Amino acid sequence: MESRATAKFMRVSPRKARLVAQNVNGLPVEDAMNILKFTPNKPADIIFGVLRSALANAEQLPGIDVDAMVVKQIVINEGPTWKRFLPRAQGRATKIRKRTSHITVILAEGQE
């Protein structure tokens, strides 16, 4: 049985979030939460919250052993990009792209 949680329009670059997601993909939930808790960057905090939400969703399903849950997959998709302009010299402007991510965590019952 699977459990999933999604966070959309998160203000973190998909490229940076994928680096963190690769570290915990396929691990037991307890190990993944420990790694994310002590990883000192913004994507780790966001993925940690989505992982907790997926675990809470799994507790609502009947007949699921929450202690045996494994991170089956973490999907980081690109969300819309917010465009801003930074004024520069002589009337010019530079485009700033603030990237967003859609983060999905899928948990499954598995053998450790």
Curated annotation (Swiss-Prot):
- Tell me which Pfam families the record gives: Ribosomal_L22 (PF00237)
| SUPFAM superfamilies assigned to the protein according to its UniProt record, in alphabetical order | Ribosomal protein L22
**Record InterPro entries:** Ribosomal_uL22, Ribosomal_uL22_bac/chlpt-type, Ribosomal_uL22_bac/org-type, Ribosomal_uL22_CS, Ribosomal_uL22_sf
GO cellular component terms, alphabetically, are: cytosolic large ribosomal subunit
Record's superkingdom?
A: Bacteria
Q: Which UniProt keywords apply?
A: Ribonucleoprotein, Ribosomal protein, RNA-binding, rRNA-binding
From the UniProt record, which GO molecular function terms apply? rRNA binding; structural constituent of ribosome
Q: Which GO terms describe its biological process?
A: translation
On whether Ribosomal protein is a keyword of this UniProt record, the answer is yes
UniProt entry tagged with the keyword Ribonucleoprotein: yes
Quaternary assembly:
Part of the 50S ribosomal subunit.
Which protein family is it in? Belongs to the universal ribosomal protein uL22 family.
| Functional summary from the UniProt entry | This protein binds specifically to 23S rRNA; its binding is stimulated by other ribosomal proteins, e.g. L4, L17, and L20. It is important during the early stages of 50S assembly. It makes multiple contacts with different domains of the 23S rRNA in the assembled 50S subunit and ribosome.
Q: State the name under which the record lists this protein.
A: Large ribosomal subunit protein uL22
Q: Which gene encodes it?
A: rplV
